[in-house]
Amino acid sequence: AGRFTYNWNYRYFVDFNFGYTGSENFAPGNQFGFFPAFSLAWNVAEESFVKNNLKWMNMFKIRYSHGKVGNDNIGDNNRFPYLYTIATTGYNSEGKPNYVYNWGFGDYGKSFIGTRYTQMASNGITWEVATKDDLGIDLSLFNDKFTATVDYFHEKRTGIFLTREFLPEITGLESKPKANVGEVKSQGFDGNFALKQKLGEVDMTIRGNITYSKNEVLEKDEENQVYSYLYQKGYRVDQVKGLIAEGLFADYDDIRTSPKQEFGTVQPGDIKYKDVNGDGVVNDNDKVAIGATTTPNL
């Protein structure tokens, strides 16, 4: 790791740093990652045209930063994913082998006990990388009685460590392998302020802050879906999906003339759900994005 910092007269600022980091969680050849970052800042309040005319402005700093951050936290249960694991057959409570391999048919059929893979090796797994950009302003006025900070941030996270879902059944895998198959972008702004005032012998400070952030799943290894709205791609992380309620069933005639609700027997007074795809039935293929996520944007 290394860092270079330069400050000229508290007016211009330059900072560069980097890290070259290794992790035991990845296979040789993928263990190391290089993560650089830099930042630039300009304190406009130190310029003569401001100092001579706006004496009540103590600081007005404009700054920008760009950098990459690596993440090797794949969970204790997923350590060393580049190693495969196998298990012997073992026996159940009846004394019979758990895993039996059958060969041949009819009178020529044979059964053999053996071992099986419990985890496939994922040799290509490497660092999850977040590319971050931040544009901000730091403000201080009236001898630091009022201070404020505002930031706009943007992050694109690639190589997110997830379980593979788009795998054909003919692979015969008992457990799905892991891979760097996720990609998410997020952006928003963050602001805070502080107002300080002395009233006699009492020092008072009023503080406030606000944060707004939104994200979107750009890539995720998912099974094929009949309808595009069933994918998580294109929606927010942890987006809640469900059926759309259209009202209540008035009577049995209403039930008979409405799309069939496949999740159970309905009666008058039960909720009537919308047939989103128009196929005449209401089931999991009619679940769409509804409501907010588990983490609010604001």
Listing of model-derived features with the role each one plays in the protein:
Residues N43, S65-V69, N209-N215:
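Short glycine-rich beta-strand segments
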Residues V50-V129, K145-T147, D151-V184:
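Solvent-exposed loop/turn elements at secondary-structure boundaries
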Residues F13-G22, V44, G109-T118, R164-K176, ...:
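Flexible, solvent-exposed coil segments and beta strand-coil junctions
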